[in-house]
Amino acid sequence: MIKNLISAFSQGVGIQKKELPSTIILNKDDYKEANYYNYYRNLELNKPDEVLARRIAGLAPIAYQYYNVSSFDNNQFKIVDFSIDSKLNDTCLTCVWTQTYKNESKTPVEAVYRIPLSPLSTVSAFSVQFNGKTLHGKIKDSTKAQEKYDDAIASGGQAFLAEKSKDDDNYFNFKLGNIPPTESSITIHITMISEIGSHLNSLHYLLHRYCFPQSSNYNFSLSLSVNLSNSIKSIFFDGDKSHSLQYENKEKTKCIIQYKKSLGFNTQPNILIVFELDDLNKPQSFIEKLSINKEDIKNNPHSDSDSDSDDEENKKENEKSSYAIALNFFPKFESINKEDIYQKGEFIFLIDCSGSMSGNPIDSARRALEIIIRSLNEQCKFNIYCFGSGFNKAFQEGSRKYDDDSLAVVNRYVSNISANLGGTELLQPIKDILSKEIDPEYPRQIFILTDGAVSDRSKLIEFVSKESKTTRIFTYGIGSSVDVELVVGLSKACKGYYTLIRNSSDMETEVMKLLSIAFEPTLSNVSFDWSQLLDLSNGKSTTIIQSPTQIRPIFNNERMMVYATIELDNDISNNIENHGQPVIVTMNADGPLGDRLSYHVELDFKNYSQSNSIHTLAAFKRIQDLEEIERKSSKETEKLEIIKLGKKYNLVSKHTSLVVTSDSDSPTEDTMKVINILPNNSQHPIIVDRCHTFAVNFNSPLQYQQQQQQQQQNFNSGFAPPPPPMMSSGPPPPPGSSFGAPPPPPPGGAFPTSSISEKKSSSQSSSSYLPPTMSLSRKSSLSPSSPSKNYPSPKLSSPSLSYGSTQSESTPSNDPLISLLAKQKANGSWSKSSIQDQFSSAISKIPNELSAVEDVWATLLVISKIMKTFASQKSKWELSVQKSNKWVKQQLLKLNLSFDQFLELAKSNV
C-alpha cells in the first residue's frame, strides 16, 4: 500500500468537523500508475496544452481555441457555476454535474462540446432547466434521437442532445440547440455512473483538471457522500486545505467530504481523494433493491414511450422486486512461498527480428530466450513468435504444453533466430494470437521485445485494449531508437509492465524481472456459483445476469469487481429477505498453489440500500459485454439488447442517446450560430480500455513501478526532437534512412496504410531518440485484413520437427550459466548423463540413500554449482532453480529424506 499515506482523521465522529491538514504526503505520481488513470494519461499525451484541453470542456466560439480570448467580445456562452454531487460505495460512483451557463450571444446559438468520459463511466441522466421549467432527457435509439433533435431545431424549438461519440473514442457529445439570445440562464444536469477507480488496496476518487472549463471566474463546489461496507483506515486529499470531512458513524464507514473554490483561467490541479480500507482477505458484497410499480413507470420522466410493447414489457418486468449485487475482492498472497507457486499460465513471446536488431540486440534476445524457456514449468503452455515484415512461430497450431518434447522444438527454434525478417509489423502476429480462444485455466500473458516503431501504433494499442479482460502484456523497449509510447501504451492497455533497456548487454536481467512478475500469485478461471440464491426461488424460473461475464484473472495486487442483477416476484423477495440466514454465493478460482479454491460470500438481503446506482452500473457493464460481442460478431441481436438495456436503465451507449426537445413559445426565426468546441479536423485522444490497477512487485509494493518511473525519466531526459514524417506505402527505404514513431494522424484521424514498418537506423545516436509522444485515434473495430505473410521458421528445414528427443538439444554456448541451464529437463531436473563430463568427480560421491535416484543427486549438484558460482546472476536462474528444488523435494519426500541435508552435502562437493 502507499507508504506515505497518512490518516487525516483519526478522531472525530458525528457532528465533529475538521479542516484537512495540508501536511499529508503522497507519492505524487503514484496514482498515475493506476489502471484507471491510463485514460487520462492518454488524454494528457494527446492534449499536452492544458489551456486548450480545458477550453474543450467549456462552451466557447470555435476560434477561441486558436486566438487570444481578449480579441473577442462577450458574445459567448459563459459558465457561471459548476457543482458536483457525488455518492461513493464499495464499487460504484454516482456523480451529478450541474453547470449553469449564460448565453450572451446576439444570435440564436447551437453549442457543441465534448466531455471526456472514462471507459469506466457512462451517462445515465440528463436534464435542462430554463425559462422556469425542467426538461428531462429520454433515452431513444441514437438514430431516432438525432432525428428528433433535428426536427425540433428546424421547427424553431429548443433541443438538447447527449450521446456517445460516434468514433468510439469515449467522449460524451453534448449539444444545445436554438438557444435564443438574452435568454435567462440555462442549467444542465448530467448524471454519470462509474466503477470506482482503485489502486493496490485503496479506492480513488479523481476529478481530472481537464474536466474544469477554462473560462472567466466561476464558482465550483464538490460534495462527496461515502458509504462503504468496510471501515476507513485513512483518507488522503491531493489538493488545497479547504476540504472538510465529517464522519457519520463510529465505525467510520460513512462520511461526507466537501470542497469549494473559485475557478477560472488559472492552472487547476487534479482533485484526488484516496480511501485506504481495513484489510479483509475475502470478497465483500453490497446489495441494492428496487421495487417499482406500474405507477412509477408511468410517471418516470426518463421513460421512453416509442412503442406500447416496450411499455408493457417494462411494466410487467417492474412488477417484481429487483436486486443488484456488487462483489469486490482484493486478495493478498503474503504468506505464499515462491517455491510453492504452481499455477497454470500461457506465455507467448514476440521477438522483433527486423534488420535493426542485428548484432548485439538479437544475440542478447536469443540468450534471454534460452534462459526464459528454462524458467517455465510443466503447468505452462507457451509459444514464440518472430516478427518483422511478416512473422513465424515455433508452434503453428498454437501454444503447446511445456514438456521435454516441446522444449526440444523451441530450443532448436531459438538457436536459429536471427534479425532477417525486414521491417516491423507487430499488428498481424498480435491478431494471430488474440484470434485464438482463451483457455480460462491458462491466463494469457504476452511478452513483446522490440527496438523500434511500428506503422500502425494507434490501431495496435486500440486493438489490444479490447482484450484486457483476457490478456496481460509485458513490453521491453531496446535501445535509444525505440518508440517509447508503443512500449508503454501496449503494456498499460492490458494492465501489464514495461521496461526500457538502453544497453542490450543487460537484456537477460531485465527480461527476467518482468517474467518473475508474471509468475506472481494469481487467481484464475474465476466463476461464481449462484445456486443457493436460485434454490430460494421456489422452483420459479429465475435469471441472474452477471457482468462482466468473463472475469479477468486476479493478478497480484489487482482488484476484482463483479455485478449481478436478479428480478424476483414479491413473494419470493420476501422469502429471501426473511430467510433467517445470509444467502451464500461461492466464488471459485484456480489458486497459485495449483489447487481449486472456494470463497464463500455472504449476501445479507435484509441489509440493502434503496437506490439504483448498482443496478445502473451492472447494466452498463452488461452493455460493455454486449458491445464487445457485437464488435466480434456484428450481429443485430446484441444491438437490440443494448437498446433495451439502455432504455430500461436510461443509459447512453453506442446505440442509445438522451434527447430533450421543447416547443418554443416564440419560434426562433433568426439564423442560428453554431458554437463548435472541437473542430472536425482536430486530433482526438485515444481512449484505451481500463488499464486499469498496476501490478506491483510481489515482495515490495511500489518498488518496481518507482524504478520504472525513474527509468523512463532517465531514458527520456534531454531528447525532444519533433517526430519525422511517416513514410507512405512503398518499397523499403534506402540504407541509412532514419525512421521513428509515426506522426499524428491527418485530418479525420486516419493513418495512411503502410506495408513496411518504419524504424530508426540502429546507427543513430541516442540524441535522435523520440520522446514518448502518442498520436492515436480510436476508431471502430478493426476489420479483418488480408493474412500477413507467415514466414517459415528461421533456418528450419521443416515446420514439422521431430519430437523424438526427450531432452532438449542445445547448441554450445559461450555463457557457462546458459550452458548448464540448456541441459535442464522440463520438470527441472538434470540427468546424470547430461552433466557427467563436468561433474564426474562429484557424481561418483553419490550418497547411498540416492543410489537408486541418480538424477536427484545430479540435480542437487547443478543447483549447488549455480548458487555458488553464479550468485551475482540470481535473477537469471532463480525461476529455473525454483522448479529444480521443487522436483528434488518431491523425490526426496517419497524416500522420506531431508532436502536441506542433501543440498548441503552437494554444496560441499562442487
From Swiss-Prot:
Annotated segments matching region Disordered: 297-318, 703-815
Bias-annotated ranges (Pro residues): 720-749
- Which SUPFAM superfamilies does this UniProt record tie to the protein? vWA-like
Residues in domain VWFA?
Answer: 346-515
From start to end residue, where is composition biased (Polar residues)?
803-815
- What are the Low complexity biased-composition ranges? 703-719, 750-802
Residue ranges of every copy of the VIT domain listed in the record: 63-194
Query: Per UniProt, what is one Pfam family of this protein?
Result: VWA_3
Q: Which residues form a coiled coil?
A: none
Q: What is this protein called?
A: von Willebrand factor A domain-containing protein DDB_G0292740
